[in-house]
Amino acid sequence: YNLMIRYCEPYQLQTASETLGLPLVDEFDIEAKPSRSTLKETADFILKGFQHALSYNSTDKNYIFTAPITKAYMARFFFWTQDWNNAIIYAKEVLDKYPMLEADEYVNAINQKLEPTKNVIIRSYTNENDVASMGYLAAQTNVQKRPVCKNLVDLFGNTPNDIRNSGFNTKRITTKVVTTKFRSEELCLIIAEAYAHLGKEPEALEYLNLLRSKRITENYVAYTMDNLPEVFKQNITTDATGTPLTKLMSAILCERRKELFLEGDRWFELKRNGRPEFWVAKDGQKYVCQKF
């Protein structure tokens, strides 16, 4: 799964059978030189692996990848491959086991280094050791060297009572810790977006508002189809299927961007939703991010 989302083109149902996927290896052969499969074959291969893992029904947390964690990754997988119904089914099941944080819990938990919290399904940093600490400290140091994107600051400015505004200071320097974790809030966003793709607007709004209600501390107003904000101007202009953003889809993607800020999600969101080209400036030079 991780190789597919990094090294293959984003999944499109209409072209997956023609798009190149990964070389598939399911047995050891030192002389083998497998050619690349199609993206559809790659997805089928990954799903078979997930299903095999689930057959063990592991509940022992010492093995890390228990059945609920496998199902959480399956929700991500179905979401990436645009199997919206299955994405909803698996995400809902795991969301029931890992409840999201309320606003007061979020403040205390989001920057936790080692302490597990009820919403974290799996995380990469679980104990102190020299190598992990070096990587952890390097990540926190490096992120201080570049201000938070003004477009993201403007997005947060639309909801001044959002508890996540504390993720950066007035100089646009991040105060949120760079982390690698899989939180149940992502599952809520998967459900909301999947429902939107299926044309089930009331259900999409329900899950979008479920997360928003836990992040906006004062003067919270639930979104309806009548009061959704205009499409937010950003690099992403189309959804995962290539359709121009609607107000609902824009609201969901913006919520995801705010919630998963500095958690390794943005690159994949750009890839999944149209692969927009854009540029940034550094030291007087222009650097273009081409279609990827």
For the regions a language model picked out, list residue spans one by one.
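Hydrophobic-face positions in mid-chain alpha helices that act as interaction patches
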Residues: 82, 86-185, 217-239, 246-251, ...
